[in-house]
Amino acid sequence: MARVTVQDAVEKIGNRFDLVLVAARRARQLQTGGKDPLVPEENDKYTVIALREIEDGLINNQILDVRDRQEQQEQEAAEIQAVTAIAEGRR
């Protein structure tokens, strides 16, 4: 298991409070959202993986926001297609 120093991750994010929010958000995505890690798992817990991704500059708040918006737009487009297909089937 790789040792993660929080100081390296803090430098990437800006302050430790935002680091906690970003790391928790990413760890939650990894655990429940079916997201794939951007670094090798190496038998680490999701929080450690999230911190390693932040240290490597692969994840920050802006990146998470962009990804969330993209996924939301894709989901909304799929829902609109489904509703349209249902509506056309009733005609």
UniProtKB/Swiss-Prot annotation:
The keyword Transcription applies. The keyword Lipoprotein does not apply. GO terms for cellular component: DNA-directed RNA polymerase complex. It holds the Pfam family RNA_pol_Rpb6. SMART domains: RNA_pol_Rpb6 (SM01409). The RNAP catalytic core consists of 2 alpha, 1 beta, 1 beta' and 1 omega subunit. When a sigma factor is associated with the core the holoenzyme is formed, which can initiate transcription. This is DNA-directed RNA polymerase subunit omega. It comes from Pectobacterium atrosepticum (strain SCRI 1043 / ATCC BAA-672) (Erwinia carotovora subsp. atroseptica). The lineage of its organism: Bacteria, Pseudomonadati, Pseudomonadota, Gammaproteobacteria, Enterobacterales.
